[in-house]
Amino acid sequence: MAFNGIERFYVKELKKLEFSSIIELQLAEEELIRDFGTLNTIHNNDSGVFGNIDVQITDLRKKKKKIMDKIYILPPRKEILDSAMNESKIKLDISWFFDNYMDQELTNVMNYFDGEEPIHINTVVLEWFGYEGDLRTQKRKFIDMLKRNSIPYKELTSKEEIELYPTIKEEILSLPHKGAIACSKWLVMKPYDIKIAMLRLNTKNSQIIKQYYIKMEELVRLYAQYTTLFIEKEKEQMSREMNSLQLMMEEMKIANLKQEEERKLDRLMLTESRNMLQTMGIEIKTVKYNNNNLIDQNNELLERVDEVLHKVDVVQTKLNISVEDRAPQPDKNKRRERFLLLKRNDENYPYYTIRAQDINAKKALKRQKDMFSDVTILLDLICHPNTKTFYVRIKDDLKKKGVEFHLCEISIEDSQITEQDLVEAMMKINDEKREIKNEK
């Protein structure tokens, strides 16, 4: 207020706000405090821009297009839950929620801060946090914030273990002389402490980071709610199947009673026929002989029927096994599951998998082509109903051969197989769905 002048301060609009989480309430309080002091917030400042940051820290400077416009508000809860319930007859895992409702570029940036080893906080990271000015000013403001919030950090000198940090070695090469190297210190922090610090930021980019965690928290809650709904739906389906089975058993019981009554009637008629033949003077032995022949023929027919029923039971058992994980294909092509293996011009993870419905797979493929200049489709499979289970099988088999998996990304650099081996292995696992194995 003092910065802009009290005569320019007026109430433009009053709004009633509702918050669904403690984090949202804290963000609103911080924003009000910041507005009351300087009236210079992210809403009044067009400079609130995130860089398009890749997983590697050395790529943070390469792209500067806005990521803020790509961060969207989550759809209504009911819409997300309905979409998840209609997605598959098999229970989804939480990655489906993150893949469909989290901004993938921002997720790739946040994944850089995962792991266990300390990370060098250089000027690229500080600029991404929203700090301005030279490196010394950025570090001073950031360290002041860490001290205020009692967040652990460490400053390394050139005599300490700096070999583990390539970005520190690069900065040393840019220093003018040994004296500057001896006086310099480099800030490193553990990933957990960095995430705590990001939630305490009060910079132009802090809102985007905090909104990311708010969305993630909301999706975790939605996944828990989805799990409850899915279990209830399965119970209802099981109850309907049990009722149908009980009805079938009642019908079989009635049919058996009817057959027993018919057999009693047949025996009665046979007795009456025998008495009638005796009255007519017909030789009983002849009738008995003919009757035995008919009985033998009937028994042969019954044995054949038993053989046919046994074969039907075997076929039914194999059919039950074969359809256990094979749901019917959706009527609409855009709802059918696809599994794609891509090759990209990425040094660390040249191979990338997309596992989604056709409509979402096309969107994911377009995102990859936007991010990388050279994208080739090595494998495209229709993998209904569950591409997630298929991908788990692939990872279980190929990890034994040294293939490295990171979410949807794949590297065979240190493995025992070639690109052709990778494609053939995935096709072989896909073909196993046609094999029928008897359950023991």
UniProtKB/Swiss-Prot annotation:
Coiled-coil region list: 229-316
Extent of the signal sequence: none
Record's keyword annotation contains Coiled coil: yes
Organism, as annotated: Invertebrate iridescent virus 6 (IIV-6)
Keywords: Coiled coil
InterPro entries, sorted: DUF3627, MSV199_dom
Family statement: Belongs to the IIV-6 006L/238R/313L/468L family.
Source species taxonomy: Viruses, Varidnaviria, Bamfordvirae, Nucleocytoviricota, Megaviricetes
Domain of life where this protein originates: Viruses
Alphabetical list of Pfam families matching this protein: DUF3627, MSV199
Keyword Chaperone carried by entry: no
Name this polypeptide is given: Putative MSV199 domain-containing protein 238R
